[in-house]
C-alpha cells in the first residue's frame, strides 16, 4: 500500500524517480511495470502498479461502447494510459502528453493513495490542498453517509 506525499523532481528528459520506499512494493506487485493515465476529475496523473490497473481495465470492459458517456469515460482513461517500466535506478519516463496534461515541469508531488499514486505539479498540489481544506471545513462531515462513522 502506498501512503504519504513526496516532493520529487522531474529531469530534463521527463523522468521521475520513484522514492526508494515504494520501489520494493512495485516490484513485489509485478516486474516494476506501472500504468500512468490522466485523472479525469483533477489536473494530475494516476499511477497504478500493473496488476492494480488490470482490475480497472476489467471494470472498464463492462462499460458499454454504445452509451456515449461510458464510451467517452473509457476513451479518456484508456486513450491516455501508458504502460511504463521502472529502470534500474527506479526512474520512469512520463510521456510528454501526460506531462502537458498535468502541467508537470521540474517540481512535482507523488502522493500515495493506497493502491495507486497521484502525480501533481507542486504548485497545483498546494492549491488543491488549500481547496480541499476549505471544502472540508465548510462541510458537516457527519452528514456524509460514508464519513459519518469515520473517526481517527
From Swiss-Prot:
GO biological process, one term: negative regulation of DNA-templated transcription initiation
PANTHER family in the record: TRANSCRIPTIONAL REGULATOR MRAZ
Keyword set, alphabetical order: Cytoplasm, DNA-binding, Repeat, Transcription, Transcription regulation
Protein name per UniProt: Transcriptional regulator MraZ
Domain SpoVT-AbrB span(s) in chain numbering: 5-52, 81-124
Gene Ontology CC: cytoplasm; nucleoid
A GO molecular function held by the record: transcription cis-regulatory region binding
Underlying gene: mraZ
One Pfam match: MraZ
Main location: cytoplasm
Organism encoding this protein: Shewanella denitrificans (strain OS217 / ATCC BAA-1090 / DSM 15013)
Subunit details: Forms oligomers.
Family designation: Belongs to the MraZ family.
Localization, UniProt: Cytoplasm, Nucleoid
UniProt-listed HAMAP family: MraZ
